[in-house]
């Protein structure tokens, strides 16, 4: 695996692996304290990334940033659930998603411009003052939950009880199991000689499965605050909702992964232009969240919203299959809107469908559990889409270039393109057109998979409505 890939992979591994810990840990240590830790780790990580001396240090600091980043979204959602009544929860989640969407749009749209104009370091350093300001605001406005304040005036008042509450063994098992799984996905879809079926890579998957099974057994017996209480996931209804969350996470992140590649390689966009092309459609993601929030508060129509959101995601993924190199820009932008709007509706509705099944005291761990399953889906979505594109692209090149180049030149070209997609710019004539056409078809194959999984999520919605909700303590 290219060392440069670890810049992204390191963050992905730690953010996903540590994310499920924040629910139970914040129950034991306090929301405010854990939020300060997460924001501090994220801030220090971004600062260190900006001053990294080499790519190894940059990758390591991205891992530190991921430890904090994995908790920021989870804890902000949990804090909202603590202080906001359920009747108004949708509106506040809508505004949270609006701000999150605005930040994502800014990052996607201007990241390439910042990197190409004043340098990549500023993509990290620009986040530091924003994170410092958020810490100051947290100090004044974010309290610990009432249950924590009644039991502990500080984390040092009763350290023995707190240590008994923290599920240390469960934390080690889930972090190790998820890390091995993410390493399997990352190495399997890399451009090296390794693949998902390589014995050394398969060992990572086997190890991940064994350790995660041990984690489940441990969670059933632990006397500490479970990372994922089994009562949250032991009903058919809960399993179906979490499965929907995995599928929409897979489809949405596979979609976001393939779009920039398609724009840059098939349409010939620069990095900055590819980001800007996503700006207007991306605005519909927070719009979808606002629609969800106000509809929930006024009509209490979670079930209908989930159908609408997933249907729009399916439509958006399906429409992408018809985008061509010759498609006008206005039509491309129009075809991108449904998937973004659907994601904005689906993400909060799956969250509330799950956490509203449980009592207020269980909603922190329920939130982190759902976010974990969604994150797993997103990681699998990106990794499998990358694998499908790579395998399809290589196969199509061998087939389509057979009459233009000899076998050795085709193999050499595949290696060069796998290592650096910008190598396409040095090609000419029929060879270049064939390479672009092959990549177009490869991305469409990956996107067809996302379309099918979106339809499967829709089928599970129908199945969910025929299942009884679990009876939980209130």
From Swiss-Prot:
Its main location: membrane. It is found in: Vacuole membrane. GO terms for cellular component: endoplasmic reticulum; fungal-type vacuole membrane. The chain crosses the membrane at residues 34-54, 63-85, 98-118, 122-142, 168-188, 197-217, 239-259, 274-294, 304-324, 332-352, 376-396, 448-468. The keyword Membrane applies. One of its GO terms (biological process) is transmembrane transport. Residues 55-62, 119-121, 189-196, 260-273, 325-331, 397-447 are vacuolar. Keywords: Amino-acid transport, Glycoprotein, Membrane, Transmembrane, Transmembrane helix, Transport, Vacuole. It is a multi-pass membrane protein. Glycans are attached at residue 420. Disulfide bonds: none annotated. Residues 1-33, 86-97, 143-167, 218-238, 295-303, 353-375, 469-474 are cytoplasmic. The keyword Transport applies. GO terms for molecular function: basic amino acid transmembrane transporter activity. Transporter required for vacuolar uptake of histidine, arginine and lysine and to a lesser extent tyrosine. Belongs to the major facilitator superfamily. This is Vacuolar basic amino acid transporter 2. It comes from Saccharomyces cerevisiae (strain ATCC 204508 / S288c) (Baker's yeast). The gene is VBA2.
């Amino acid at each position: 695996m290219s060392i440069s890939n670890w810049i992204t992979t390191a963050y992905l591994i730690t953010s996903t692996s540590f994310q499920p810990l924040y629910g139970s840990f914040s129950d034991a240590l306090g929301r405010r304290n854990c939020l300060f830790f997460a924001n501090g780790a994220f801030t220090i990580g971004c600062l260190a990334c900006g001053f990294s001396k080499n790519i190894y240090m940059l990758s390591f600091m991205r891992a530190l940033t991921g430890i904090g980043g994995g908790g920021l979204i989870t804890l902000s959602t949990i804090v909202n659930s603590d202080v906001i009544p359920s009747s108004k929860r949708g509106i506040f989640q809508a505004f949270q998603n609006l701000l999150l969407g605005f930040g994502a749009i800014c990052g996607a749209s201007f990241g390439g411009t910042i990197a190409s104009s004043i340098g990549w370091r500023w993509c990290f350093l620009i986040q530091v003052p924003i994170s410092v300001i958020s810490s100051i605001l947290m100090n004044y406005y974010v309290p610990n939950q009432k249950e924590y304040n009644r039991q502990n005036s500080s984390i040092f008042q009763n350290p023995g009880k707190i240590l008994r509450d923290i599920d240390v063994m469960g934390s080690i098992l889930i972090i190790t199991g998820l890390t091995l799984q993410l390493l399997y996905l990352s190495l399997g879809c890399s451009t090296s000689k390794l693949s998902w079926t390589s014995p050394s890579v398969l060992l990572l998957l086997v190890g991940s499965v064994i350790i995660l099974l041990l984690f489940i057994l441990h969670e059933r017996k632990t006397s500490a605050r479970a990372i994922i209480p089994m009562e949250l996931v032991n009903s058919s209804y809960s399993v179906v909702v979490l499965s929907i969350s995995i599928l929409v996470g897979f489809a949405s992140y596979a979609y976001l992964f393939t779009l920039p590649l398609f724009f840059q390689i098939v349409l010939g966009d620069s990095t900055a232009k590819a980001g800007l092309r996503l700006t207007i459609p991306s605005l519909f993601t927070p719009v979808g969240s606002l629609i969800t929030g106000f509809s929930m508060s006024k009509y209490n129509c979670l079930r209908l919203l989930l159908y609408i959101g997933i249907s729009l995601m399916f439509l958006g993924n399906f429409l992408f299959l018809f985008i061509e190199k010759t498609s006008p820009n206005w039509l491309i932008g129009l075809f991108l809107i449904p998937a973004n709007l659907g994601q904005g509706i689906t993400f909060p509705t799956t969250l509330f469908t799950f956490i509203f099944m449980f009592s207020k005291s269980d909603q922190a761990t329920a939130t982190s559990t759902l976010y974990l399953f969604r994150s797993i889906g997103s990681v699998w979505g990106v990794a499998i889409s990358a694998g499908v594109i790579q395998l399809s692209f290589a196969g199509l090149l061998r087939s389509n270039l057979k009459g233009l180049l000899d076998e050795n030149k085709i193999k050499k070209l595949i290696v060069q393109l796998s290592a650096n997609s910008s190598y396409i710019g040095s090609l000419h004539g029929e060879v270049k057109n064939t390479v672009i056409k092959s990549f177009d078809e490869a991305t469409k194959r990956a996107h067809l998979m996302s379309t099918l999984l979106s339809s499967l999520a829709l089928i599970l919605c129908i199945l969910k409505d025929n299942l009884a909700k679990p009876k939980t303590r209130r």
